[in-house]
Regions:
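Catalytic-core regions of core metabolic enzymes
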Residues: 1-707
């Protein structure tokens, strides 16, 4: 849908409010917000008795809305739920293109069919809907405050929220911190317009520099991923996702299912999309302010300039936990610092100016650190006391930012700009401030914000902002686009109710190009001995039974068989152990030695479809929980990034003298698995555990399928 399609929603020429306009009612609150917010267009109150709103003499009242010379672009609906459809149909008859339905009592209260009827009525009437069960919308450029929440300050952040209460809390917190918004949308139950359509529109809105989003659920996860992938190529998206706890996970029938819980899948979507996820409201405001005020971050090396050692160390610790670097101060910078800092100041990074640090110390230290090539960003920390002039220290930081901007021929602050052109001599560098100690730093903090420098309450939160910038700009530089279109679904010939037997599954997967060690299926001892003679030794013997899910736990796997006699004994012992387990025979494999064991698998998520997993494999899969997920399909480059994100990647690179293993072969297997899962929607879960990664090639050691 074209981005211009929502223009009249956010830039209406006139607004009609449906519902009671008595003081204290939602209709009256909406009109009060619009009048006091300075909405420049026409306002109308519509209710059956044509009651005029108390205390708002400029707003005319009507018993019904009729087509007129003054068209209405937006209806705000705050009538009881049984009357909403009637209002929407009347809006359609009057040519109103948009309605925001604040009324509750629909799907959120269990009345799903009533909400479907509302959506049908809106479609019939040609009216696009926000809501129901929402808190309204705002657009500060249009002075449209069509919401029951506190009016937003003007700014360059757009905020979309499923929860009206969370939206109100964010607006209140932002107002306390002086953070403004371009657009606010509480979209509630999204009976029509959803977060994906709003994101597309805001991605092209010139008033919006960054988009914040509070989510509780998604109606179409795959389409949402594609949308966010497109949007983040143009501007940052910062997401809060509720429901991270283990109570949202289901019981799983495979290793992949156990590792790929619902929140883990959502996190994979975030990483794949280029969005940045934060845990809560304050962190979202931190990062949105960072994106609107800070220059793009070109690297990960951070210098910390502080007047107190403890907060500097805490900041450094958190920065490194988040994958940022806090490298030693280069000798060239140390030499410059020695020219003006007292001998007792620590220069290592953090650079500790001590409590005696002055305006000049901050200004010159920041300029010395950021002027060269040793650092990509800075955090300036001031732990104030009643005896320090924090305003003067703030002026020193602003002075450094201003002079660096002029010296580098570009803005030190002011993101989110387009990516810095490759080959430019100097890139702008982010500079964030941390001013602590409550009331005594209020004026200093205000001056910093007015000068374009964001102020965070702790160094740890400043580090999180820089890490968020790093993640976003690093992802935006990667080649590649959105999730490919889903292939036409194919029927799985193995489809059955329950586990598929290993011999059939291996034959199917080999035909699809997946590699296995030399193997054979034997239904009797004689067949097992004949197969062993053909395959050679050592061998692995594995039970084939529809009742056994984890073979090693049940005694259904025997390793290291090096003779026909050993195979005969193992076969007889296995039949005895598994009596009554519906043993259908055994699989024999040539045993793979000298490999790194990994796991690869796929799980079908209800919101995002097929999700591929790679991680540390073998016996320690769920113990170590070292795994990475991606939504399928994807290609080899994405698979290589997945592998590189694992702690187990060090084993593949060659560890303590061991040879490097074939990461490329593992990546090819993952990409092939992603394509397979996309073609066969009947696959619910598929495990390859272990996958033996060799110096050349990779082989699947065990496989399990649920359909």
């Amino acid at each position: 849908m074209a981005s211009a399609s929502l223009d009249r929603l956010f830039h209406p020429r006139s607004v009609a409010v449906f519902g009671s306009v008595k003081r204290g009612k939602i209709g009256h609150q909406l009109l009060t917000q619009l009048v006091e917010g300075g909405f420049p267009g026409a306002l109308l109150a519509v209710n059956p008795r044509a009651e005029a709103p108390e205390g708002l003499p400029s707003v005319p009242a009507f018993a019904a809305l009729k087509p007129s010379a003054q068209p209405v672009d937006l209806a705000l609906v705050a009538v009881p739920a049984p009357f909403v459809n009637e209002v929407i149909l009347s809006c359609g008859a009057a040519g109103v293109p948009f309605a925001v339905v604040l009324t509750s009592g629909f799907a959120e209260a269990g009345h799903v069919e009533e909400e479907r009827a509302l959506a049908r009525a809106a479609c019939q009437a040609g009216v696009r809907l926000i809501g129901p069960n929402c808190a309204g919308i705002m657009n500060t450029a249009s002075r449209l405050y069509a919401s029951i929440e506190v009016r937003a300050l003007p700014g360059r952040t757009a905020f979309l929220t499923q929860s009206g209460a969370v939206g109100g809390a964010v607006l209140g917190l932002a107002r306390e911190r002086g953070i403004g918004f371009s657009t606010f949308v509480s979209y509630g139950n999204r009976a029509d317009i959803d977060e994906a359509e709003l994101l597309e529109y805001l991605s092209e809105d010139p008033q919006t520099g960054v988009i914040g989003l509070y989510l509780e659920s998604l109606s179409d996860g795959r389409e949402f991923l594609r949308t966010v992938q497109r949007v983040t190529r143009r501007k940052p998206v910062v997401i809060i996702k509720a429901g991270r706890s283990g109570s949202g996970l289901r019981a799983a029938g495979s290793h992949t299912g156990a590792l790929a819980g619902s929140d883990a899948v959502f996190q994979a979507m975030v990483q794949q999309s280029g969005a940045v996820r934060v845990p809560g409201m304050e962190e979202m405001l931190d990062l949105c302010e960072g994106f609107t005020r800070l220059a793009p971050l070109a690297g990960s090396r951070v210098v910390i300039v502080t007047n107190s050692g403890g907060p500097g160390i805490l900041t450094a610790d958190r920065a490194e936990e988040l994958g940022l670097e806090v490298p030693p101060t280069p000798e060239t910078v140390r030499a410059a610092l020695r020219e003006f800092l007292p001998a007792h100041c620590a220069l290592a990074n953090p650079i500790d100016l001590t409590v005696e640090g002055t305006r000049e110390n901050y200004s010159r230290a920041l300029r010395a650190a950021l002027a060269g090539e040793g650092f990509d960003a800075a955090v300036a920390i001031n732990v104030a006391t009643p005896f320090l002039d924090s305003v003067a220290l703030a002026e020193g930081i602003l002075e450094a930012a201003s002079e660096l901007e002029g010296a580098e021929g570009g803005r030190v602050q002011g993101g989110p700009a387009q990516p810095t052109a490759k080959g430019s001599a100097r890139a702008p560098k982010p500079l964030a401030a941390v001013f602590m100690a409550g009331e005594i730093v209020v004026e200093a903090s205000r001056r910093l914000k007015d000068g374009g420098v964001p102020v965070l309450p702790t160094g740890e939160r400043a580090a999180a902002v820089l890490a968020g910038l790093r993640d976003y700009y690093r992802h935006r530089e990667r080649p590649g686009g959105e999730l490919p279109p889903d292939p036409d679904p194919e029927t799985l010939s193995l489809a059955a109710d329950g586990p598929v037997l290993e011999p059939d599954l291996v034959d199917f997967l080999e035909a699809e190009g997946f590699p296995f060690p030399p193997h054979a299926y034997a239904r009797s001892e004689r067949q097992a001995l004949e197969a062993a003679g053909r395959l050679g030794f050592p061998l692995v013997l594995k039970a084939v039974s529809p009742r056994i899910l984890h073979k090693s736990d049940a005694g259904g796997v025997v390793l290291g068989l090096r003779s026909l006699q050993a195979v005969r004994r193992a076969y007889a012992a296995m039949r005895g152990r598994l009596e009554g387990q519906d043993l259908r025979g055994v699989m024999l494999y040539r045993q793979v030695e000298g490999a790194v064991e990994m796991i690869a698998g796929v799980k079908r998520d209800p919101a995002f479809g097929p999700v591929v997993l790679v991680g540390a494999g073998g016996l320690f899969t769920e113990l170590l929980r070292d795994a990475c997920l991606r939504i399928a399909p994807f290609e080899r480059e994405e698979a290589l990034r997945m592998i590189g994100s694992l702690r187990a990647a060090r084993l593949l690179q060659g560890y303590r003298g061991s040879p490097a293993r074939d990461r490329g072969a593992l990546a090819d297997l993952l990409a092939r698995l992603a394509r397979l899962a996309s073609r066969y929607p009947a696959i619910r879960e598929l495990d390859f555990n272990p996958v033996f990664v060799l110096e050349r090639g990779a082989l699947i050691g065990d496989v399990r399928l649920l359909v």
